[in-house]
């Protein structure tokens, strides 16, 4: 199974890049985990929010492999504990389909992506800056993997 974090926005503060890369590198070699950053639509006059989200949605779709399980990150998604995320990660692995976890841009994700998602999860009840969302997702996935692997990173 391949696990892709597909996020709108290519520039992050150095600390966020470093943290996200660190968590993704911690996965064992047989886990194919990657970050795919897609270009945010420029916020210029004359463009509606829906038009900008639609342009970003096209870039997200292009970054996702065909037949991939699409998991949208949204504040209205399902709330999971670490143990529940570990169970979900294990179920995805057993299913065998590649998984793309989608993080929207400043205005969120287009409704077409939300409506077409296989699942919608939330990272927090709070609205998070994109840099935090990427780091938090990478850490949460690594922690979930560690639970399933019996690795000492996670402690109850």
Swiss-Prot record:
Main localization, broad class: cytoplasm
CDD domains attached to this UniProt entry: RlmH-like
GO CC field: cytoplasm
Tagged with keyword Cytoplasm: yes
Catalytic activity: pseudouridine(1915) in 23S rRNA + S-adenosyl-L-methionine = N(3)-methylpseudouridine(1915) in 23S rRNA + S-adenosyl-L-homocysteine + H(+)
One Pfam family in the UniProt entry: SPOUT_MTase
EC code: 2.1.1.177
Assembly mode: Homodimer.
Entry function: Specifically methylates the pseudouridine at position 1915 (m3Psi1915) in 23S rRNA.
Alphabetical list of HAMAP family matching this protein: 23SrRNA_methyltr_H
Protein known as: Ribosomal RNA large subunit methyltransferase H
């Amino acid at each position: 199974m391949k696990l892709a974090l597909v996020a709108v926005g290519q520039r992050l503060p150095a600390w966020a890049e470093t943290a996200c890369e660190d968590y993704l590198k911690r996965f064992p070699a047989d886990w194919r985990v990657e970050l795919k950053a897609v270009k945010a639509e420029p916020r210029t006059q004359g463009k509606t929010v829906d038009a900008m989200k639609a342009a970003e949605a096209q870039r997200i779709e292009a970054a996702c492999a065909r037949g991939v399980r699409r998991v949208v990150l949204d504040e209205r998604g399902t709330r999971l504990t670490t143990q529940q995320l570990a169970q979900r990660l294990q179920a995805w692995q057993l299913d065998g389909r590649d998984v793309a976890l989608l993080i929207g841009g400043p205005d969120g994700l287009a409704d077409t992506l939300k409506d077409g998602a296989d699942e919608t999860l939330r990272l927090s009840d709070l609205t998070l800056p994109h840099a935090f969302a990427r780091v938090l997702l990478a850490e949460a996935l690594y922690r979930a993997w560690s639970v399933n692997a019996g690795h000492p990173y996670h402690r109850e």
